[in-house]
Amino acid sequence: MDPGTLSLFQRVSTKLGWDRDGGLDDAEEKLRKSLKKTRRPALASSDSSTGPAQRLELSDSDNSSGKENRSQEEHILLTSDDEDFEKFLASKATPKSTFKQSASSAQKPREPVPVLSSESDNEFELFLNRVKTPKAKVQPQSMSSSDESLKHFIVDSMSSDDDFVTEKKPSIYKGKAKTVKTPKSVQKTKKPAPSLCNSPVFLSDSDDDCNIVIKSTWRTRHSRPPSDEHQATSKDREETEKPRVPQPTITVKSHTSRDDTCSSEEEFQSLLDRVRQNLGGRTSASPMPSAEPKPQRPCLSTPSATGRKTGSQVPVKDSPVIHTPVQQMPSSRPVLSHTEPRALPNSRVVVCKTPGCFLQSLSAPGSVYCRSFKQNKDELTSKLYQLYNTSVFDSQLPVDMSVTWNNKMRKTAGYCISGQERGTGKRYARIELSVKVCDSADRLRDTLIHEMCHAATWLINNVRDGHGPFWRLYARKAMLAHPELPMVSRCHSYDINYKFQYQCNRCKNTIGRHSKSLDTTKFVCALCTGQLVLLTPSKPRAPTPFATFVKENYGSTKQELTGQSHAEIMRKLSADFASKTRLSQS
């Protein structure tokens, strides 16, 4: 202890009289008595209820104020010299008034006697009789889960219950049954007799609560555990404790999530069986297997999405669950063999029903129009225009619309020019296609229908909306008429085939050109200012026979025609080459 603190403690002890003999002991005794007085109201309003013959012992230490879920060996000790406080606890040992109780339990005086609410149980019994879905296997599970819940819901009479009281959830804490247990049986987690229960167990009769026993821990008050995990743990607890203690005679029945799940699955299965029987009666499908009751699996899945049908013609109790194999289920889908090749997900297997349609063949590399596209592209363009005009646009476009090829378009596949004549006011449209981009039959097929949709919006609907609703309408109509067409999109994604490729020697970026017009001495890479190098140089052409003849005979002919011009020498060489060629051919 530092000198400043020591001097301060000496002054305080001198002022309060602690420096005298026995002064500190007297101060300690006063402090203990003041603490006992302040904690008695909290204990009087606690949740724990005691029996008439119960003996509570007070301890002098604060460690006895254990919180809600203590270990099994821990006891609640109170001092035995405070008999008035024991009487006060015995008169006030009832459940808290914040929880909603039934009308019968609210009218009774506060006495430490076990009170059972049977009104909600009778209503639930009537509901079970209406639904008629008793589960023989689920009821022991429900009883065991209710008994197991008594172990985990231990409410100690200490100040930690105050935060539990503030949780006001009337829809969750609806009291189903209230019993009284001795504290010893609660803390040692043994199954008590039905008439000796002192800790109230709050169950919920709503579907969302899934009959989860409300444990007095912070985690369970602020977050609800999953229903599947709770069901699995309650099942394990039931299996471990079955051989030890027999089942109690008095049970608290509640609408559990397991009952709801099983009954919902049974009703859904019976509905599915009736649908299958109806389908089997109308179609000549394979016979249904004989209805034999099969052992049911434990119902651990989530409830079915199908609504509950209480007024069904065939009760769920009398109809056995039939598991029909998938192969015998009647279906309208064609049965596919595992040996035949399966179509790719992106492939379109729909066959075009338009007469005279040849669009599918344009994607095959071996077709006539694909092999000799450059020679037959004008003929193919005319045939495609007539086919689209009749099948998609109902021959509303002009037959002689201008469709030309443009050599200057380097990246745009095509465009439609629309207008109106000045004198007559007649609307017109013409289409131009790029020679450098539409260099194959399938690209011509896809680009032409795109531009014809633009022309139709202007010539038929008198609308210029770009890629608006009218254009999308004609695009969808084209895909319905010709399913083999790809999606008619706004922009193309073609990889343009350039004749010449330039590459940067620093960042390896490539630039495409249709001609060898890029001067590498003047232009550099736009990304890193590196030097550009031509990747695909032009192939050297072999010299022609006339060039070879001129190279061999130019010197001798020039000597013969001394003083003559170059033109006269070339005329002489041309005449000699022509005479030589005629002699060789003859």
UniProtKB/Swiss-Prot annotation:
Compositionally biased residues, Basic and acidic residues: 65-76, 225-244
Record-linked Pfam families: SprT-like, Zn_ribbon_SprT
Keyword terms of this UniProt record: Chromosome, Nucleus
Start-end of Basic residues biased regions: 176-191
Bias (Polar residues) ranges: 94-107, 299-313
Any GO CC annotation of this UniProt entry: PML body
Disruption phenotype: Progeny of mutant females display widespread morphological defects and cell death and early embryos have asynchronous mitotic divisions and tangled chromosomes.
GO biological process: protein-DNA covalent cross-linking repair
Domain (SprT-like): residue spans on this chain: 383-482
Localisation: Nucleus; Nucleus, PML body; Chromosome
Predominant subcellular localization, coarse grouping: nucleus
Coiled coil: none
Record flagged with keyword tRNA processing: no
Record InterPro entries: SprT-like_domain (IPR006640), SprT_Zn_ribbon (IPR035240)
Region of interest (Disordered), ranges: 17-119, 176-202, 217-266, 279-318
Similarity-based family: Belongs to the serine-aspartate repeat-containing protein (SDr) family.
Function noted in UniProt: May play a role in DNA-protein cross-links (DPCs) clearance, ensuring the genomic stability by protecting germ cells and early embryos from various sources of damage.
Record-linked PANTHER family: GERM CELL NUCLEAR ACIDIC PROTEIN, TRANSCRIPTIONAL REGULATOR
Record-given protein name: Germ cell nuclear acidic protein
